[in-house]
Amino acid sequence: MIGFLIMLVSLLFVLSVVVTVHELGHYWAARACGVAIERFSIGFGAPLISWRDKRGVEWCVASIPLGGYVRFAGDENAASVPDQNDLDAMRNEIRRREGDDAVNRYFHFKPVWQRAFIAVAGPMANFILAILVFAVILVSFGAQKTSTTVGEVVAGTPAAAAGFKPGDVILKADNRQIRSFQDIQGYVALRANMPIDFAVERDGRTVHLTATPRLVERQNEISGRVKVGELGLRSAPGGRFERSSLLSAIPDATVEVWDMIKTIAFYLGRLLMGQLPADQISGIIGIGHTAGAVTNGVVEQAPNGKALAIGLIYSQFWLIASLSVSIGFMNLLPIPVLDGGHLVMYAYEAVAKRPLRAEFQAAGFRAGLALILGFMLFAAWNDLNRYDVFKFIGGLFT
């Protein structure tokens, strides 16, 4: 029970921070463009606490702490863009009610480039948050740098077949610089059944080896049962935590975030092409389990209060940065309802000089919503299966 509560608190904290920053991105961009804002809510449902600032914005903390939203004046249906007839009717109503000058304060009457800027500001805020948090981690704690020297080649594995030898120093994988053994593991994990060209230093010279990772199933304490690519290499002993300087922290963190974005895009591409098993897709249950497992691990292993505090700060920062990158990327996908879907509609409007017709928007919205809900249900099924929930329930009746 305590473990579940830790998981729940960690999940709600991390998710609230990431989503609030995402919505603040939309909020600050809208303010910069002179858009009237009606409400900023942390969470959904009935407001528990609310107040108005001097600009008339209602700030709320709502009863369901899973997400949040910002609502602009006249944006009752935030999922779509009004068509020309709706815009004309809305403009006339605003003029009648508030006067001609008020029209320009409404989101839908801003130039299309400003609306696109407001839409993209949410994901960009997530990426900026991740960069700042990773920078703090790199300065305060550092990054683990394990040796890229091969300590052992497991017999009968792809690494053995490719000709790896103990003592080889791995320099590059597919011309990508390798900085630690974790880089190798992360790169290989997503490339099962894909040949990888390794540049290896051996006896003072560089040789190239081609190895194709095999797909294996592993039980992971944090992620549960996962299928990953594996070569059969083990690193040589040795490693250290290397801190970034204040000057290099932001560039180093930016590289970290960019690498994560490329990894997510590559993983999604392989999934869509059927090159990776779809049962590896994870959702909110998986995120919660990861948050709980990481936090529980810190609580159980900390020898004293100081170590516990440091471990909790590090783990929650790491979770916030990682989830922030994922949410920022996923929101840029060109699916109606998401920010990326709005950007597609604005691109059409910029080219056609008019918004997409309302019936097409409605159809796109329904299709996008169905796609997202279907994805969430499928991901939840995978998570429950990965953590053997169905096996446990079945055992109750046998």
From Swiss-Prot:
Record keywords, A-Z: Cell cycle, Cell division, Cell inner membrane, Cell membrane, Differentiation, Hydrolase, Membrane, Metal-binding, Metalloprotease, Protease, Transmembrane, Transmembrane helix, Zinc
Function: Involved in the regulated intramembrane proteolysis (RIP) of the short isoform of PodJ protein (PodJS), during the swarmer-to-stalked transition. The cleavage occurs near or within the single transmembrane of PodJS thereby releasing the N-terminal segment into the cytoplasm for subsequent degradation. It contributes to preserve asymmetry in the next cell cycle through sequential degradation.
Residues annotated as binding Zn(2+): H22, H26
Protein name as annotated: Metalloprotease MmpA
Family, similarity comment: Belongs to the peptidase M50B family.
Example of a GO cellular component annotation carried by this entry: plasma membrane
Leading EC class: hydrolase
Chief place of localization: membrane
InterPro entries per record: PDZ (IPR001478), PDZ_sf (IPR036034), Pept_M50_Zn (IPR004387), Peptidase_M50 (IPR008915)
Cofactor(s) listed: Zn(2+)
Chain ranges passing through the membrane: 117-139, 316-338, 362-381
Enzyme active site: E23
Note: Degradation of PodJS is not regulated by cyclic variation of MmpA level.
Transmembrane helix recorded as keyword: yes
Organism of origin: Caulobacter vibrioides (strain ATCC 19089 / CIP 103742 / CB 15) (Caulobacter crescentus)
UniProt cross-references to SMART domains, sorted A to Z: PDZ
BP GO annotations: cell differentiation; cell division; proteolysis
Leader sequence segment: none
Membrane topology note: Multi-pass membrane protein
Location in or out of the cell: Cell inner membrane
Annotated GO MF terms: metal ion binding; metalloendopeptidase activity
Pfam families: PDZ_2, Peptidase_M50
